[in-house]
């Protein structure tokens, strides 16, 4: 099948089939974007009734870290594209699937392998590409960890090499923090890996996500890199609580950010959107991480861009033209579950949507936890400050409540 030249009809022999591995809120938006282009979508996750399951043509529940289960599902569904949307996947199975020519892995199996592991991507960025990063060390045992902390110095940040959304991440400020940080990291990894990265603390002015799109240029037929406006965000305990676009920054810092993003995404290859996380202080920029998929801070693009990050990803992986331009300043603010219960309800939706320029995405997750992201408020404004105030006001109006 010539991706980009021909799209079929879902649920027919001509269908263009895409399998998403990971069906959370980001995967759900990718599925919707693909379906608007007439793509047949198979959603896969580790638990039933995930947000993406609710909108896909077919849904499956498997342990995606089990290579045999993953290969069996791909063989049964025969997708044209496999699109990982989370880190906890048997990437060796994806590499075998790609090598056998069964289907294409987005962006590539190698990119998925490197980016699911903080060690792989940090060594690529710092040691192979020579990109500026914080000082770092890796540790496999508590003794190695304590030695790494002593070498890096206080304060430092510890993260499992395999985790996401801040899980297992903490700041070590003194000797008293070392043992609790190790225990927390061991409990927070998405895969039982037992290895951590210790990073020196960078005193930055702000953090950004530089969404970077690798897509086919219709004029040349070659892969071209383009950029969204920089996204600023606020993190608490490693998890995003607010994002806004555009983030004001100097011309030099923007140039350096895009150069770093271009270099790391070119090294990873393939097509699709990449979320490149960077620290910025004045004109100086440091590489932090990269995800070869839509980024949670990029939820703001549902309001800020004519083509959201999800639409850009869908178009890029299908070989279609993209347009990542900013349409309006906008912001997002997270809505947490606030309670531990299945099948919760939400009050205050009317009040939230009465905020000028506001919109909501309630993700439909079947089970709530106090700190689980259950939705997001979006808002536009004449400028970023107004958009942020509106988004926070709309998010605060939504009240998760027990449905019992």
Curated annotation (Swiss-Prot):
Coiled coil ranges: none
The pathway entry for this protein reads as: Purine metabolism; IMP biosynthesis via de novo pathway; N(2)-formyl-N(1)-(5-phospho-D-ribosyl)glycinamide from N(1)-(5-phospho-D-ribosyl)glycinamide (formate route): step 1/1
Sorted keywords for this record are: ATP-binding, Ligase, Magnesium, Metal-binding, Nucleotide-binding, Purine biosynthesis
Transmembrane stretches, by residue range? Answer: none
Question: Which residues are in the ATP-grasp domain?
Answer: 123-318
Provide the GO biological process annotations: 'de novo' IMP biosynthetic process
Which EC numbers characterise this protein's activity in its record? 6.3.1.21
Where N(1)-(5-phospho-beta-D-ribosyl)glycinamide binds, per the record, is at: 25-26, 85, 296, 365, 372-373
For this protein, the record's PROSITE patterns field holds:
ATP_GRASP
A single Gene Ontology MF term assigned here is: ATP binding
Which residues are noted in the entry as Mg(2+)-binding? 277, 289
Superkingdom classification of source: Bacteria
GO-annotated cellular components: cytosol
Instruction: Please list the reactions this protein catalyses.
Output: N(1)-(5-phospho-beta-D-ribosyl)glycinamide + formate + ATP = N(2)-formyl-N(1)-(5-phospho-beta-D-ribosyl)glycinamide + ADP + phosphate + H(+)
Q: Which residues bind ATP?
A: 118, 159, 164-169, 199-202, 207
| Gene3D superfamilies, alphabetized | 3.40.50.20, ATP-grasp fold, A domain, ATP-grasp fold, B domain
Which Pfam families is this protein grouped with?
A: ATP-grasp (PF02222), PurT_C (PF21244), RS_preATP-grasp-like (PF22660)
Query: How is the subunit organization of this protein annotated in UniProt?
Result: Homodimer.
Protein family per UniProt = Belongs to the PurK/PurT family.
Main function:
Involved in the de novo purine biosynthesis. Catalyzes the transfer of formate to 5-phospho-ribosyl-glycinamide (GAR), producing 5-phospho-ribosyl-N-formylglycinamide (FGAR). Formate is provided by PurU via hydrolysis of 10-formyl-tetrahydrofolate.
How is this protein named in the record?
Formate-dependent phosphoribosylglycinamide formyltransferase
Taxonomic source organism: Burkholderia pseudomallei (strain K96243)
